[in-house]
């Protein structure tokens, strides 16, 4: 992407969460090894005893929208959750990704060729980042938010209402690969695929991105993210939370999106290096 300097300028005033040197060292030599290698049964028992809402949300739906909201809000009630949400690299990186992606999406909306711009959000859950972007953008836009499961939609509608965007979001349940023409009243000017690629196989990433690419105008942007192992707790997530994620480098994910017809990529890491938020554009 030729305007990388311009994109960096969009982010200059954002505040992100970071680890200090001492805290980073403690996580590497003490905290992460304990979390990753303590008996999983013991850790689950402790989390149940302390009534961890974050753990319960992941046990019910690993990586689902409820656990994401707990991490986003950053204000849990239980002591165990306070430690996890404020001390864990993944929740901190999630909040960084939210700030970074919402700003990028808002600026992409402002540069859409039409007004109001149409945002298509895939794997939307409650659509928090999309709603944040609609509220931030200085031009009019509306969003179609699609997910296979409608469970998060009520929360999403209420969140959008409180953000002043309640009349600009439309939630739909279904598979975009087979029903895209029924779901869209207008081709998307911007596509958002945040927080889903890490739960998809390579084949699923390509098939979903290809379906969307076919209805986008040439040069229209898509926003998505890769997930790296920099959080340091994959073993903990798998053993204790039952959360299995697909880790890819930014280049590996860009290669998959390239197979679906996207190119001209720009990758922006959040400060912890766990997520790279990537802008790609439809070729042609």
Where are these regions (language model features)?
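Class I (Rossmann-like) S-adenosyl-L-methionine-dependent methyltransferase catalytic domain
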Residues: 2-41, 49, 63-71, 76-117, ...
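Class I SAM-dependent methyltransferase core
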Residues: 121
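Conserved acidic residues
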Residues: 189
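A short His-aromatic
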Residues: 198-200
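A conserved beta-strand element that flanks and buttresses the S-adenosyl-L-methionine
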Residues: 192
């Amino acid at each position: 992407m030729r305007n990388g300097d311009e994109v960096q300028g969009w982010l200059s005033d954002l505040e992100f969460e970071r680890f200090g040197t001492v805290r980073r060292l403690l996580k590497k030599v003490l905290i992460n090894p304990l979390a990753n290698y303590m008996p999983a049964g013991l850790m689950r028992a402790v989390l149940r005893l302390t009534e961890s809402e974050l753990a319960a949300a992941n046990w019910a739906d690993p990586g689902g929208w409820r656990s994401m909201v707990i991490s986003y809000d950053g204000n849990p009630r239980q002591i165990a959750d306070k430690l996890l949400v404020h001390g864990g690299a993944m929740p901190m990186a999630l909040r960084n990704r939210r700030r970074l992606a919402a700003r990028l999406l808002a600026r992409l909306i402002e540069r859409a060729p039409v007004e109001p711009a149409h945002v298509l959000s895939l794997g939307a859950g409650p659509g928090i980042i999309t709603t944040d972007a609609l509220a931030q953008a200085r031009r009019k836009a509306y969003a179609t938010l699609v997910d296979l499961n409608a469970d998060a939609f009520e929360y999403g509608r209420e969140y959008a209402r409180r953000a002043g965007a309640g009349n600009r979001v439309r939630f739909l349940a279904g598979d975009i690969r087979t029903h895209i023409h029924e779901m869209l009243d207008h081709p998307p000017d911007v596509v958002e695929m945040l927080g889903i690629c890490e739960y998809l196989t390579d084949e699923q990433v390509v098939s979903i991105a290809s379906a969307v690419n076919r209805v986008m105008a040439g040069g229209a942007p898509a926003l998505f993210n890769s997930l790296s192992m920099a959080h340091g707790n994959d073993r903990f997530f798998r053993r204790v939370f039952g959360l299995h994620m697909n880790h890819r480098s930014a280049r590996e994910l860009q290669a998959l999106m390239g197979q679906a017809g996207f190119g001209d990529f720009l990758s922006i890491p959040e400060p912890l290096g766990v997520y790279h938020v990537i802008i790609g554009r439809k070729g042609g």
